[in-house]
Amino acid sequence: MKKLAKKLLCLTAVLALTLSLFTGCKSKNEKTLFEYAGQEVTFQEAHVYARIMQYQAEAQYGAYFGDSMWSMQVGTDSKGKKITMQQSVKDSVINQLKQIKVLAAHADDYNVKLTKSEKKQIKESVTAFAKDSTGKKVMKKTEADKDMIQKLYEESTIASKVMQAIIKKANVTVTDDE
């Protein structure tokens, strides 16, 4: 009887530990990479943007610079430290995501919503992206599905509309003297 009790206790402990491994865990793609102004950015969101920028840069500059383009110096920071193409792309992705998240978070403040026409256009763009060779590579590498890509398109479109609303509200005019 004592042996049976020990085995049951052991089995219960093993089951409890096993279940704890599977509950409350997020996949790498769902994990929050960073938070900015109260807005979460997941690893997958950043990964999608980074891959798009990577493939665009490789298509544009790869023939000229080859694989060494990512370690090539493209500038210096305020401390005089060299900035590589790779670091520049990473920084651009982070800054772009920060801007999109903050602007999209203010959509209600400017009464910005997607129209039916915009939603239709986004759906068509997502379908085209998923069929495009670059889009296929991005989706495969990042494990993003069409829903994820659509979410990014929608958020980016909303951010753009908020930016337009801010500019319109500011009523900025530039004279010839400036």
Features from the language model and the residues they span:
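Bacterial N-terminal signal peptides that target proteins for export
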Residues: 2-11
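Hydrophobic alpha-helical transmembrane signal-anchor segments
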Residues: 10, 14-18
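Alpha-helical transmembrane segments of polytopic integral membrane proteins
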Residues: 18, 100-104, 159
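C-terminal motif of bacterial Sec signal peptides marking the signal peptidase cleavage site
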Residues: 20-24
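Acidic/polar surface patches and capping/hinge elements
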Residues: 147-150, 161-178
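Acidic, Ser/Thr/Gly/Pro-rich low-complexity segments that form flexible
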Residues: 155-156
